[in-house]
Design a protein with these regions (language model features):
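Well-ordered, non-membrane alpha-helical segments in soluble/globular domains
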Residues: 50-60, 140-147, 202-208
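Short, conserved loop/helix-junction motifs that constitute active-site signature segments
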Residues: 30-31, 59-67, 152-153, 213-217, ...
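Conserved beta-sheet core of the metallophosphoesterase superfamily
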Residues: 69-73, 95-96, 169, 173-252
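Active-site neighborhood of phospho(di)ester-bond hydrolases with catalytic His/Asp-centered motifs
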Residues: 13-16, 36-41, 69-77, 102-104, ...
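Conserved catalytic scaffold of divalent metal-dependent phosphoesterases
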Residues: 44, 73-196
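Active-site environment of divalent metal-dependent phosphoester hydrolases
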Residues: 18-24, 43-47, 73-84, 107-109, ...
Length: 252
């Protein structure tokens, strides 16, 4: 799916929302004519459909008054079914809150300066302790792109994702899982034997996607959430930005 927002002057990325929804919305009121892109974990689909739609209608009022758009990719704490192209929630938003878009995986957002690839999903490290389809979702992980994806996309400037490739913060893995230096993940892995390998494989998938696209066209930015910390680094002349919870980051 391609989404054209080339008329908006400002581009701002938002870190995980979680419990800071009011703070984030209050910050958004400081901007007009702005395209906001959320890196996920807005808890969409965790509570009832009606609870979500009530919240969206309130945010829609603010966005409409500011002539702004909010695009949301899915995190591991969002229900993946709501981000499908023909989902009931996407249909509701189209008819009742058109300034809010739940972005399907591997959609491309076009702005006046950038082509932005959106990749949702991530593994929950505490999944074995959570309730399926309430606190975590079985298909929460990053999905592989379609076979023809790389043939159709050769001019991506920014990748926005929920998780991060292996080469970006946090640098948890050495070669082939010989060493893993995340205390918190190692703690959960005592009760979840496939956790470390599952995380490794999805971050390796992101790395592979980046490398194939970057070989065709230089990726200027890699922007992501999930890790709840602001860290900036460089890889192959790509600026990698990990966003804090509730952080707004403007890209010129």
């Amino acid at each position: 799916m391609t989404l054209d927002f080339s008329t908006y002057k400002n581009l701002i990325f938002i870190g995980d929302v979680h419990h800071k929804l009011n703070d984030v919305v209050n910050q958004m009121t400081n901007y007009s004519n702005t395209l906001f892109i959320s890196t996920g974990d807005c808890s969409i689909g965790v509570k009832s459909f009606e609870t979500d739609t009530d919240i969206f209608e309130k945010i829609e009022y603010i966005l409409a008054s500011q002539n702004s758009i909010l695009c949301i990719i899915r995190g591991n704490h969002d229900n993946p079914k709501y981000f499908k192209k023909n989902s009931s929630m996407r249909s509701f938003l189209e008819n009742n809150a058109p300034h809010i878009i739940l972005v399907p995986d591997y959609s491309v957002i076009k702005t006046s300066n950038y082509n932005i690839l959106c990749i949702g999903g991530a593994r929950s490290i505490d999944r074995v302790f959570n309730v399926k389809n309430l606190d975590w979702f079985q298909n929460e992980n990053i999905q592989k792109p379609d076979d023809n994806f790389f043939n159709q996309n050769d001019d991506i400037d920014i990748i926005v994702s929920h998780s991060a490739p292996l080469f970006a913060y946090p640098l948890e893995f050495s070669d082939e899982l010989k060493f893993y230096n995340s205390f918190i993940v190692n703690s959960y892995a005592l009760y979840d034997k496939t956790l470390k390998n599952d995380i490794y494989k999805e971050r390796l998938l992101l790395k592979g996607i980046y490398e194939k696209l970057n070989n065709k066209h230089h990726i200027q930015y890699l922007i992501y959430g999930h890790y709840h910390k602001h860290i900036e680094s460089q890889y192959n002349k790509t600026k990698c930005i990990s966003l804090e919870i509730g952080e707004l980051k403007q890209i010129n």
